[in-house]
């Protein structure tokens, strides 16, 4: 998937105040009564008022072909709220709305369009507050405390539907086939789209559309829908409705990256850091019963225990998967943290990454050539760095205006407290020694002869993840590092943004008048003892990068305040999130994968055993989206990521890539 900045909608508002597309010469909604038309065509055409109370699942999934102003979504959300108020004991508790938009409105145009419908204001304001920046791919918005999920896919729907992960197949309960009229936008109304709609529709799923065009009806019938005409809204004579009355065979293009969930809703999580905390919250929101086992006497004593950590994306012109994942993970993280109902020290002050030498300058120049939205990243010249950061560096760079810093330790502790209020059970000082299958469950053996049995297990215990027989062959490694805590000075107190160079320096935390500077890097080490060498090196790297800056030379590390931790990392800098792969079975079953791709079956994994690991140094950026991805996978719900990027997070990816090329695979 090519990475590019999405072009915003080119529109104007007519005399009635209705938005009109200049490119397609068509209105976004009816000049007469767009709200009532939406209720009639899409809610009525899919019989949602009748289906909601009878729905046999806790989640109802709606997909839409053109988001536009969000009128259909807001109207549905309003109706869903009214349903929940009238039927609080119904099986259906959550709404998932998936929509595609090639030319998203700007936030300003969106707000202007929403003024048409004052009765939708309570819902429209929440949508506007989380409106994503124009990046391609999926933007997941968690609304109404997680009861409503909106997946906004920015890009061409005919391209995007071919790039969706198999987790979306046969998941859609109702389709809203909307968009500009077929005569105005023929490129959207294709057989390719109709086939994708059929593939994604659940057996018994429905569709509705405002048009009655013959080629649309015939195309949907060819795809597998049973179609019928219905009286149109207002002056329109007819519209179309359909139902998927059959179960279509599903294609599988890359079985080696298949993801399996679990029919069970009870899980144990092994860990105690940010990954465990955020995954607990995501599973609880989906109705899981969750137990957390932490080896330490308190949470966040491992890699998640730092006072300050920087939040900004990891970008690379030469690695599309890394680029796509981290840009969308970053924007999701900001939305997630902003709406999280817990307190934690943070400041979205911005992050500036500086080119202190020729190599770093070249890397930044490559990042800036990717046509990124200004909301995500902008170039900053050397003479402007002092103005935006508060300190002189004599370097140019790239600024992430929505980045900043937060306290990982406080975040982790308070998220776990919130999760406990929602039913999470936590056991501290439970060191997992081994785990094994027993009667379709997992038997967990802890130090001190403690045992527990759980239906599903998630390993989220950082660098200790490879200590079990099921995970000992994973290609992950430990990285020990030391962060120095330095007292502020009059010059350092002027620092307004996080600085990244051959290290990083945070603005002072008002809670303690200290900065964090770091971090040392010792690959393969798990040593957490204080190191005076590391303390001095943290200071020296700052001086070496900014040799003309007097403020850098005045950094004082003499009080020996520091924190040492160990991270878990991978060679490709991407997390490992998904099923725990079975190494031995993979080598056997995929021995001839390079020659027999067409005969491949799903990759071997351990049943009901999952992992959430290798967050490296960017866990604050990646953990929220990874938690959402894994919780969705475990619950057999739509995953907010395209197939190729999701494959790059699969724990078996490094083995499979070699096997596909006919190369030998080694453990670790």
Curated annotation (Swiss-Prot):
Localization: Cytoplasm
InterPro entries noted in UniProt: FAD-dep_OxRdtase, FAD/NAD-bd_sf, MnmC-like_methylTransf, SAM-dependent_MTases_sf, tRNA_MAMT_biosynth_bifunc_MnmC, tRNA_MNMC2, tRNA_S-uridine_synth_MnmC_C
Entry annotated with the keyword Iron: no
Spans annotated as FAD-dependent cmnm(5)s(2)U34 oxidoreductase: 270-668
Broad class of the protein's primary localization: cytoplasm
Superkingdom assignment: Bacteria
Record-listed E.C. numbers: 2.1.1.61, 1.5.-.-
Pfam families assigned to the protein according to its UniProt record, in alphabetical order: DAO (PF01266), Methyltransf_30 (PF05430)
Family statement: In the N-terminal section; belongs to the methyltransferase superfamily. tRNA (mnm(5)s(2)U34)-methyltransferase family.
Name of protein: tRNA 5-methylaminomethyl-2-thiouridine biosynthesis bifunctional protein MnmC
Native source organism of the sequence: Escherichia coli O9:H4 (strain HS)
Lineage, opening ranks: Bacteria, Pseudomonadati, Pseudomonadota, Gammaproteobacteria, Enterobacterales
Gene: mnmC
């Amino acid at each position: 998937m090519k990475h590019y900045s999405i072009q915003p909608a080119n529109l104007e508002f007519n005399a009635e105040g209705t938005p009109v597309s200049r490119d397609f010469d068509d209105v976004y909604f009816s000049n007469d009564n767009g709200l009532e038309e939406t209720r009639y065509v899409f809610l009525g055409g899919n019989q949602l008022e009748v289906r909601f109370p009878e729905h046999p699942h806790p989640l109802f999934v709606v997909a839409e072909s053109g988001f536009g102003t969000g009128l259909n979504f807001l109207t549905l959300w309003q109706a869903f709220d009214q349903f929940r108020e009238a039927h609080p004991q119904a099986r259906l508790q959550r709404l998932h709305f998936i929509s595609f938009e090639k030319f998203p409105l700007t936030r300003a145009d969106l707000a202007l369009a929403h003024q048409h419908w004052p009765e939708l204001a309570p819902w429209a304001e929440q949508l506007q507050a989380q409106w994503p920046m124009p990046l391609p791919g999926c933007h997941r918005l968690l609304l109404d405390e997680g009861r409503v999920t909106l997946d906004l896919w920015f890009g061409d729907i005919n391209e995007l539907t071919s790039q969706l992960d198999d987790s979306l197949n046969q998941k859609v309960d109702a389709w809203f086939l909307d968009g500009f009229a077929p005569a105005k936008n023929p490129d959207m109304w294709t057989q390719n789209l109709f086939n994708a709609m059929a593939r994604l529709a659940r057996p018994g799923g429905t569709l509705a559309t405002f048009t009655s065009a013959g080629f649309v009806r015939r195309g949907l019938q060819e795809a597998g829908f049973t179609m019928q005409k219905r009286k149109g809204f207002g002056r329109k004579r007819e519209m179309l409705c359909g139902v998927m009355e059959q179960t279509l065979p599903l294609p599988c293009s890359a079985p080696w990256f298949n993801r399996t969930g679990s029919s069970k809703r009870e899980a144990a999580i092994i860990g105690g850091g940010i990954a465990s905390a955020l995954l607990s919250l995501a599973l609880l929101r989906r109705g899981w019963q969750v137990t957390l086992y932490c080896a330490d006497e308190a949470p966040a004593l491992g890699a998640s225990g730092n006072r300050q950590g920087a939040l900004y994306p990891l970008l690379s012109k030469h690695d599309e998967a890394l680029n796509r994942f981290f840009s969308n993970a970053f924007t999701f993280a900001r939305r997630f943290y902003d709406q999280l109902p817990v307190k934690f020290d943070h400041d979205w002050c911005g992050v500036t990454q500086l080119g202190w030498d020729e190599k770093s300058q070249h890397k930044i120049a490559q990042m800036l050539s990717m046509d990124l939205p200004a909301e995500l990243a902008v170039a900053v010249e050397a003479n402007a760095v002092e103005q935006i950061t508060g300190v002189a560096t004599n370097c140019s760079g790239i600024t992430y205006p929505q980045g900043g810093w937060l306290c990982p330790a406080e975040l982790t502790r308070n998220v776990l407290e919130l999760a406990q209020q929602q039913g999470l059970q936590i056991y501290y000082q439970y060191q997992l020694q081994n785990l094994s299958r027993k009667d379709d469950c997992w038997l967990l053996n802890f130090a001190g002869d403690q045992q527990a049995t759980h239906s599903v297990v998630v390993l989220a215990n950082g660098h200790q993840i490879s200590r079990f027989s099921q995970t000992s062959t994973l290609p992950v490694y430990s990285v020990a590092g030391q962060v120095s805590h330095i007292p502020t000075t009059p010059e350092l107190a002027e620092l307004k943004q996080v600085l990244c160079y051959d290290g990083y320096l945070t603005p002072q935390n008002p809670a303690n008048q200290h900065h964090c500077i770091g971090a040392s890097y010792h690959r393969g080490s798990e040593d957490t003892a204080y190191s005076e060498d590391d303390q001095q090196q943290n200071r020296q790297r700052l001086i070496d990068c900014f040799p003309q800056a007097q403020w850098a030379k005045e950094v004082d590390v003499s009080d020996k305040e520091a924190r040492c931790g160990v991270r878990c990392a991978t060679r490709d800098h991407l997390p490992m999130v998904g099923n725990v792969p079975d190494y031995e079975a993979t080598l056997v079953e995929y021995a001839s994968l390079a020659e027999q791709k067409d005969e491949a079956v799903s990759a071997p994994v351990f049943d009901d055993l999952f992992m959430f690991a290798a967050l490296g140094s960017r866990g604050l950026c990646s953990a929220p989206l990874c938690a959402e991805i894994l919780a969705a996978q475990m619950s057999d719900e739509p995953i907010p990521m395209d197939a190729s990027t999701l494959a790059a997070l699969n724990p078996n990816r490094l083995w499979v890539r070699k096997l596909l090329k006919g190369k030998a695979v080694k453990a670790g």
